Amino acid sequence: MKRLVLIVCFMLMGATVMQAQSGLRVGANIGLPVGDMEEVSNFQAGVDLAYMLSVADMLYVGPMVGYTRFFMDEDNFGGFEVDDPAFLPIAASGRVALAEGFFFGTDLGYAVGLNDGNDGGFYYRPQAGYNFGKIGLIASYTGISVDGGSFGSINLGIEFGL
């Protein structure tokens, strides 16, 4: 009887961890610009919405859409007001769940430029995190490759499973 109770408990715990990865996820992140943007941008902020589906044991994929903005430092432009580059990333998202709530994954797609003269570019965001049930903490790198340069930031974020 004890063995049966233990087996059922472990099965329920595993189902809870697997269920925490799938479904609708809403996230927000802030980051420090790196690379081409390091000298001209103060910080980056973004939000995203993803729907993750379990396709195999501990493997999740789904569509993701978001909003990312790099806040420009006007002092570096002689005091002139400069539009903050903003993007609408549309991507495929994938994650691999590891033991004890840890996961890693990536988003790959295209970031649509939302400003005049901002044509957008290839979007990628590798990430690693830890899920506390319906809430997760994520460390990531956001990269957007555009003609003539790139936008990049190292981020820390939180996401909520709905």
Predicted features and spans:
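Cleavable N-terminal export/targeting peptides
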Residues: 1-23
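Mid-chain, well-packed structural core segment of small domains
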Residues: 97-118
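Residues that define the transmembrane beta-barrel architecture of outer-membrane proteins
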Residues: 22-24, 41-45, 84-88, 120-124, ...
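Helix-adjacent hinge/juxtasegments
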Residues: 67-104
